[in-house]
């Protein structure tokens, strides 16, 4: 388990190296922010097993939207609650076991806000990148939770659920 900040090129290299250790495991960097740079680096370096999300594009003079695929994972308002609810269900039903101490720590401050959105307590009161401050000055994050939610979603929807033990 790793938590911290490193330059994006080193992060991409770290992901690629860990993915290779696990027989080129599927990688799905979140592309909402700086993850697009990480995904681009992985693509440029030829990582063979990136996750691609599908986007429907409406083109002029076309009746049907066209599908286009983009590398990485894009969290949207439509899929955010779905992936969190599916992770919660799979944890409750013991389909997954989480041993990540950062996930456990974040779970204590992960709530549903007034609009019913799953979010780290106080997250949008004062935004400071991935760490946020609430009114009392305490920091909260939901990075580990969303990382596990994305991983769980991809695990549930992939063609193969084979787990490869590293050499």
Predicted region positions:
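Mg2+-dependent endonuclease catalytic cores in nucleic-acid-processing enzymes, primarily RNase H-like
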Residues: 1-119
């Amino acid at each position: 388990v790793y938590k911290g900040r490193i330059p994006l090129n080193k992060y991409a290299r770290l992901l690629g190296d860990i993915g290779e250790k696990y027989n080129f495991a599927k990688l799905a960097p979140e592309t909402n922010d700086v993850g697009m740079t990480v995904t681009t680096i992985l693509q440029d370096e030829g990582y063979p097993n990136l996750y691609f999300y599908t986007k429907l594009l409406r083109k002029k003079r076309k009746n049907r939207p066209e599908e286009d695929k983009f590398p990485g994972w894009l969290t949207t308002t439509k899929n955010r609650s779905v992936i969190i609810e599916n992770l919660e269900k799979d944890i409750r039903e013991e389909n997954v076991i989480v041993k990540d101490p950062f996930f456990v720590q974040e779970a204590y401050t992960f709530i549903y806000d007034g609009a019913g959105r799953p979010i780290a307590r106080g997250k949008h009161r004062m935004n400071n990148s991935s760490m946020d401050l609430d009114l009392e000055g305490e920091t909260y994050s939901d990075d580990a939770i969303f990382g596990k939610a994305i991983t769980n979603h991809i695990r549930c929807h992939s063609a193969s659920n084979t787990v490869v033990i590293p050499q």
